[in-house]
From Swiss-Prot:
InterPro entries: Enolase (IPR000941), Enolase-like_C_sf (IPR036849), Enolase-like_N (IPR029017), Enolase_C (IPR020810), Enolase_CS (IPR020809), Enolase_N (IPR020811). Its main location: cytoplasm. This is Enolase. It comes from Schistosoma mansoni (Blood fluke). Signal peptide: none annotated. The active site is at E210 (proton donor), K344 (proton acceptor). CDD domains: enolase. It is an enzyme of class 4 (lyase). Its EC number is 4.2.1.11. Belongs to the enolase family. Pfam families: Enolase_C (PF00113), Enolase_N (PF03952).
Amino acid sequence: MSILTIHARQIFDSRGNPTVEVDLKTSKGLFRAAVPSGASTGVHEALELRDTNSKAYMKKGVLTAVSNVNKIIAPALINKNIPVTNQAAIDKYMIDLDGTENKEKLGANAILGVSLAVCKAGAAEAGLPLYRYIARLAGHEDVIMPVPAFNVINGGSHAGNKLAMQEFMILPTGASSFTEAMQIGTEVYHNLKAVIKREYGLDACNVGDEGGFAPNIQDNMKGLQLLEEAIKIAGYTGKVEIGMDCAASEFHKNGKYDLDFKNPHSAESTWLSPDAMANMYKQMISKFPIVSIEDPFDQDDWETWPKLTSSTNIQIVGDDLTVTNPKRIKQAIASKACNCLLLKVNQIGSLTESIEACKLAQDSGWGVMVSHRSGETEDTFIADLVVGLCTGQIKTGAPCRSDRLAKYNQLLRIEEELGTAAKYAGKNFRHPKV
């Protein structure tokens, strides 16, 4: 089945910034994909092409990337006449067309938009639901429903409070299904709102980019205490565990970590050494039901990562460290830096490379968590992706804001469609049994 037309346009993400949307037509219909973008981006990510030479949209326009799809990728792909079911060949052709290591010529946002639209068209051609088609591309015979990691307290670059760490998450690992996980997650979320309102007032219930609350606290331990209290009030102690995304690259300064980095006058004497940070994490793990910590150190602090990973049995997730890039993942595997990959399709810029990164991590005994970005759209691709890749865990924000709920609602539909065949990862979310 050949591609008839490809058309890209500039739309807006959940933060009001421009992003790329691609429409692809085959004889089976029109298939649309939109590309997300991040706030705390790793320096090693594939290049998201922005119109930095234009003042429009605060220099964040994507008309160059859109033009690259319409004037370069579209005619070349249509002329090449590769079947839409040959995802790997189409992705490789676009990567070769770009010819740079980090996709800086055409833009990772241009290539990814086409790549995701091709996948949706391929699923239709194969007569399969998108999640089943992705499972086939990844070589999986079965699929699994993921544990959602709801980001319910926002800090770091995602919120205007003083909290250094970016995300405090709840994982309903004790649920028996994804549907029950949604019930547990939303009930804890609403109880958390009541707790925050009681302690800090109504304006502390404003939400951040990903739908989590952003109370003006600075003590990270306090964030964990608020979660623990909300879980207890909701009646789910033991059924809900805690995850964190520290995004430590954001507050890494001169080899140390500044937990007061949003204060321009923060005292250097209070900055923590890498070992002091590691000890703080160990303290947190001993006091709270923490099962996952993401980016606990700077993206190039290769020396400190393995120390924490080897000294704890919880999940240590690489995001800015690995940026879904096979080269960085191999380096992290060799140095035993972490034991889980955060998978973001726009960090690497094509579906085929995302699947390769996922399999590389899984083959090394790592867990894999599929993730949204802080600048999201109504596109639900990652919901089908996490089910098809059988990773067992997804983070796509709080149960609040339509750009986040779109993914969770799609997962509810998938579980409903699977019926009695649906399996929920639960406590085995790190290494789900397919």
